[in-house]
């Protein structure tokens, strides 16, 4: 079986001391590839370095100025295009809306989101969307901007079923983390149950969101298998089918083979 971690932050300092061991555990678990996300200016350099060094497992890069970061110089379509045109950067993201950490007039956040979508369209690259307590508004913008043309995924999905279906209708996919293994995530598991497997991806969002039985510890790409196991249990499917379909979905999204 082959798995993919569609969203990781193994470029973060939490992995600075043992990244080779993390990659070896990833390989041993059957996780053949991962997306490495850069969220700040300059972070793309480490992402590009990791992608260039990767063999097995394969790493693919993504970059965007994260929607939580208000107190930084605003980006531009030109800056996003310049950074994300690198061949090591396979996707634009994570970008989107965050109503959990950011309050007040968030027009700047929506404008930033639209700039990333414009750049992604120009580059012909897919978009990784961060939407926290803002899923419905994010999907509205994605639909308005016809982001399905480039392909997009709502990462670390935590919204309701109607919004997830609207995301799929707009041409996107929905990705789930280890949160679906949490005891209090019954409503989210029902969303997983109702969605077609052909529209799902799996991720760790490591070092955050470690699944049960690792909850409270540092997350890592090998643990994406626990997410796949939970989806298989929820949907009463074999783990092999969940692995195969979610990996195919990722390849279609990222427009890469491995």
For each of these PLM feature ranges, what is it?
Residues 1-258:
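Mid-domain alpha/beta scaffold segments of enzyme catalytic cores
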């Amino acid at each position: 079986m082959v798995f993919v971690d569609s969203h990781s932050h193994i470029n973060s300092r939490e992995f600075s001391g043992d990244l080779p061991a993390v990659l070896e555990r990833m390989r041993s678990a059957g996780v053949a590839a991962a997306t490495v996300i850069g969220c700040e200016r300059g972070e793309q350099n480490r992402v590009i370095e990791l992608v260039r060094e990767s063999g097995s497992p394969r790493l693919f890069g993504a970059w965007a100025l994260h929607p939580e970061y208000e107190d930084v110089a605003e980006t531009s379509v030109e800056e996003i295009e310049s950074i994300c045109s690198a061949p090591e950067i396979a996707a634009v993201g994570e970008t989107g809306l965050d109503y959990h950490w950011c309050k007040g007039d968030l027009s700047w956040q929506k404008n930033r989101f639209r700039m990333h979508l414009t750049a992604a369209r120009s580059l012909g690259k897919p978009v990784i969307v961060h939407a926290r307590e803002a899923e419905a508004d994010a999907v509205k913008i994605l639909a308005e901007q016809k982001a399905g043309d480039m392909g997009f995924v709502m990462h670390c999905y935590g919204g309701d079923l109607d919004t997830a279906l609207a995301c799929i209708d707009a041409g996107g996919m929905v990705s789930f983390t280890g949160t679906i293994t949490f005891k209090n995530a019954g409503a989210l598991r029902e969303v997983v149950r109702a969605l077609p497997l052909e529209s799902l991806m799996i991720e760790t969002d490591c070092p955050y969101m470690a699944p049960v039985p690792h909850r409270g510890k540092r997350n890592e790409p090998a643990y994406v298998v626990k997410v796949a196991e939970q989806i298989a249990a929820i949907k009463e499917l074999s783990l092999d089918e969940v692995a195969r379909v979610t990996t195919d979905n990722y390849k279609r999204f990222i427009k890469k083979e491995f």
